[in-house]
Amino acid sequence: MDECLPNSCLLGVHLVISTHSGPQIVYHYPPSNTAFLTNNPTKHQHLYGNHANLNKNTSTNKEEKLFNSGSTKTASQIALNESAKSYNTAITPSMTNTNTNNVTLPPTRSHANTVGSQSSIPAATNGVGYRKTDIEDTSRTFQYQETESETSSSGLSDSELSTDYLDISSDSFSISSSLSSSSLSSSPSSSSSSSPPQDGLSRTNSSFQSTDSMSPTSPQMIMENDSISVAESYLDSGTNNKSRAASKRSQNFFHKLSTKKSTDSKTHSPVRKLKSKPSQSTKKGNKLLKNTSNETDGNAFTGSCSISSKKSLSSTGEHNQELRNSSLNDTPGQSPHHYHHRYHHYHKNAATSQRNSHTQYDVEEEDMEVSAMLQDGKISMNEIFFEEENFQDINKILEFDNDFVAEFCSPEREMCNTRFEFTVDNFCFLGLPIHVDSQGRWRKSKHKNKTRSKRSSSTTTNISRKKSIASKISSLSENTLKKVNSGEADTVYDSNIGHEASTDTPNLRINTDVSGNEFEREKEDLGKNMNMFHVCFVMNPHLIEYNKRIDDMYQFVVTRLSLLLRYVQSKTSYISSECHIILKEKERVLKHSKTYQSIRGAGNKGKYLYQRILAKSSLARALTECVDKIQRNEIACLEINDDKVISLQIPIQNEFEKMPNFKLQPVLRGSYLTSILNMKFLEKSSLRIESQNRQNDQAQFSDTNNNIYRFGNNINSTGHCGAANVDDGDDNESNYYCDDNDDLLNYALLLLDEPNNIISSLETFSYQDDIGTIILKHLVRNIQPNIPLRSYRYLITDLLDNPSSLDDLTTETNSLESSILRSCALHLMYWRHARIVIPLSSKYTYIVSPLAPIQGYTIDDYKSTSQNDGNVKKMDDRENNKSGSDRVPLIYQNSMLFRSKFPSLPSLPIFLSLLSTDKPQAYSNIIPSREHKPVYLNALAWLIQYGYVTQLLTFINIRVDKHIKMAVDEDLEKEGFRKTNTARRPSMDYKKTDKKLDDEDGQSRDANASEACSGKNEGMQSNDNNKDVDEKDNENDSRVDDRDDNEIAIADEEEILHFEYDDPEMQHDYTIILEPERATAIEKRWLYRCIYGQPSDIQILFNKLLKYFNGKVPMELVIIKEEISRHDLKKLLNALDKYLIEIHHW
């Protein structure tokens, strides 16, 4: 069993939503195959190593990458740079190669898609870029692309490439085919060349595409800035130059169609030449291509709009110009009905071309945004999942179809809002599905307004929903609005009106608002139809570790993330909005992105798709980061809805109160062996915060400015991991609240890293102007491990400029400064920057830890002792044999660090030998002089930080011997407690007296004696009165006596159960009082007898420290908490050495 080792067993995550049309998978990560994710010898190793070397030495060094916690930050930074580089290199040579001999059609590209070097950006004029095309090498280039496309797969199903989004009828094919048929007849030699068939394209359409695009007289269409300009290629270079100059001067192709006078302009002279073709060939071409279009599916046209179809689209647009001119001239042989029919097709085709142009422009502009986000580190994902040997179809999750996974991850409403655990083969699907209630609410309202009507409530909900949707749409259309307001945007054709829109800015704003309204309506429809969402995690733990791994994942990650998402969904419809963004972006990339279709390889295509989705959706970024960080056993800091921050982690078990059996259950080297557990404070604080959140609905999550309390969302609770309903209001609180006196401010903080590294990490995961971050950085710079936290209240007072009285103890404990200090300490503890210790002192005793990292080569060198996975053991043995001479043992690595940090001190082995003696002694015994004390204390802090040394604490128990018991028994007999009914029940007297004493206070012996005497007199009077009653009363008295005997017998059993280790019958010589603070009456008499005859100062000090003499609280902490001196404590121990037992333990 490896339960003590950090292993999340997490494979991936997927988001499922359920609407009226059924469940569907919105997003899943990673899209890797099952063999790679579940391969134990290499599982997660790429996550720990340096990402920069993965692409270089994937095959040779894949097995040599080990976990190194110290290089996590550097590796993540290098990984971001690699992501940006791989994003640029993922584009095919047809887009980035500057060699004109290898250039592919279409030769014109906007620099928006060219994110590589500056040399790959073509010259641009008026937003349109041109690239020269070598017609002689065209055939060879297309032949190479066709071969490459045949050997590569997109990893997509046919359903992903459907053309439901395009509103193009088969008539549009016939309209756009006249020019291509003419070019077929004019250049038969060009038909031998073929364009590369893209993924999802049929062979028929592919060959047709090539013949049209390879014609020397076919025009080339360049889409840029929502406009379409025509540049025609002719065999005559002079004519070609003139046509290109004319196309540069043109601002919009459809604007030229808006006026009849534009048909006589010079820019349309090439169109007249094209129109002078015989009309018979045009009619034949229309019939031929009409039949061809009926046989081809929608995927064919999508492919024609992807990469090589720029000429085809331009042919369509050019022939629409020709068709409009011929329609406006009303040529003979065409009826008015025929004119209107063709004019209707022109409007429809022009609107479609404009919509495709606008979509393509947005895609190219977003490519640049993705590249910028990659370079800035805003998009991060593990690229090894997208390698060709590891990537799988994006429509599958662990070789299961998306529909199959969506079905069983969408339970009924009665089974939602509780723990979901579904096992398929060796995989466990774990989650917390969130479903709306019968009234359509995501969560119960804490503040119900009974006087409000249902109609007003629904109206308010719709208004708030529209406001939230409008706020998100504004961010999407920000770039478009800027261009509209500056007058740089081009005109947009309005197909609904039937004529072209002018270039005025108000009309453009109206069109922008119309598209925004459509986006808003679709998003609102999805929000209304969605009734369930489920963030489901996939795991594959070992059978022997199944319960622990699953419970930890559910308790620390699944529950917290799902409840936060439910909160933001109920407030702002965040989940439905993000799902709509993901689905629309996925559809745009798969159907309209030429960059996507030009990329070769299924892995590169999938990587580009995920980069585009991550650039758009914050929810996708959060889920991706959560999986990557949890797999690396790191802390995932997720940003939800731009104003909610939550940190998730599965705590690493690196602290133990009892000695672990590390030979059978390996642990991390350098783990801490101590009774001061950090997790106890984190769990206690989490329970307190959750109870506050239950009382105040807006606590923690809604407060975005007071970021100092954000740690409350990060700390994990200790409730049961069962399938308790999340709507239950009861707390499953453990008995942590019983130790409220254990204040965190009585401890000291020991930093686990250099202060500069911690400060840089705080700046990365927090806001720069946050008051909490400022306090944390100031505290990290000044913290010392030998000073309690309560001594740093002056720092908070100086920063907040809020002086307070330090004289009142209540004010000092519950003040704002104290609360901020506790929050800062918990934050540093949760983020693994520090741990709490008892303030270091040279007068305390320290020993070498049994878990000291002496053996092994790294802190995670536990795999060699693994009993579960033979492959891992063999791999580690092979690595050890291959690089045995190059690897340095861990003790010598730390020795070099110790020597560099403390050059004036003995070496690490010698220093440890000084502490490891037969009889533990105070740390001051090894300090040579007073001048060496600061250096030795710093060395002690370093040794505790690396797990070499632990503190030997002192615990005290109270032992009561038989002499104390006999003295108390004699006192009870003198006071008359032993003389009641001794003749009739001699064996019950002692226990009955104990029962009477337990029911009383026991604070004062005199009060107890007087009460006992009064009870005795009343008993004697009752016995005298009983002599005068009749026989019937005597029978009743006997029944009462029998009932008293039964009650006493039951009380005796309870007494025996209460005293687990005590012996009331005094069969043993001594008794240990386990809980002096909750002592019974007889135990209090024993304690009073122990200090009887002692000086008053000893009695006062004993009563003050009595509650700590339970063997659980170390005396080193009591000295700080009660503010007493070691001398007073030593004096007390010497005076009561017969009754106080000292226990030395870690």
UniProtKB/Swiss-Prot annotation:
The modification Phosphoserine is found at residues 76, 486, 987. Residues 441-455 have a biased composition (Basic residues). It is found in: Vacuole membrane. Keywords: Meiosis, Membrane, Phosphoprotein, Protein transport, Signal, Transport, Vacuole. Its main location: membrane. Belongs to the NPR3 family. This is Nitrogen permease regulator 3. It comes from Saccharomyces cerevisiae (strain ATCC 204508 / S288c) (Baker's yeast).
